[in-house]
Amino acid sequence: MSAISRSEVEHLARLARIDMTDEELDRMAGQLDAVLDAVAQVASVVTDDVPATSHPVPLTNVTRPDVVRPGLTAEEALAGAPASEDGRFRVPQILGEEA
């Protein structure tokens, strides 16, 4: 049985505002199903005797100094938005009642 349906992929694509053809939806459903199967397989491994680690190889973070640079204006930031209102990003309401 599939872990993710085509309609769920369609719903996710709509939430992400990604236009997908029927062929792409079918292909993506299969690919995501394979990913979820792989995750389930990894989750099923018994690791009671394996000590917890954050990373198997010791690494040191390499950072750079913070440098102040000019950012985008509100207009520039909103220029790529699919919808805006009163100088803000307009997004679908997902919580609460209609205002």
UniProtKB/Swiss-Prot annotation:
User: Any idea which UniProt keywords this protein has?
Assistant: ATP-binding, Ligase, Nucleotide-binding, Protein biosynthesis
HAMAP family (UniProt xref): GatC
Query: Which GO BP terms, alphabetically?
Result: glutaminyl-tRNAGln biosynthesis via transamidation; regulation of translational fidelity; translation
E.C. no: 6.3.5.-
Q: Which family, according to the similarity comment?
A: Belongs to the GatC family.
| This protein's name | Aspartyl/glutamyl-tRNA(Asn/Gln) amidotransferase subunit C
Instruction: Kindly name one Pfam family recorded for this protein.
Output: GatC
Q: Which cysteines share a disulfide bond?
A: none
Q: Summarize the protein's role.
A: Allows the formation of correctly charged Asn-tRNA(Asn) or Gln-tRNA(Gln) through the transamidation of misacylated Asp-tRNA(Asn) or Glu-tRNA(Gln) in organisms which lack either or both of asparaginyl-tRNA or glutaminyl-tRNA synthetases. The reaction takes place in the presence of glutamine and ATP through an activated phospho-Asp-tRNA(Asn) or phospho-Glu-tRNA(Gln).
Q: Which reaction does it catalyse?
A: L-glutamyl-tRNA(Gln) + L-glutamine + ATP + H2O = L-glutaminyl-tRNA(Gln) + L-glutamate + ADP + phosphate + H(+); L-aspartyl-tRNA(Asn) + L-glutamine + ATP + H2O = L-asparaginyl-tRNA(Asn) + L-glutamate + ADP + phosphate + 2 H(+)
Q: What is known about its subunit structure?
A: Heterotrimer of A, B and C subunits.
Q: Name one GO molecular function term.
A: ATP binding
Species name:
Kineococcus radiotolerans (strain ATCC BAA-149 / DSM 14245 / SRS30216)
Q: What class of enzyme is it?
A: ligase
- Source organism, top-level taxon: Bacteria
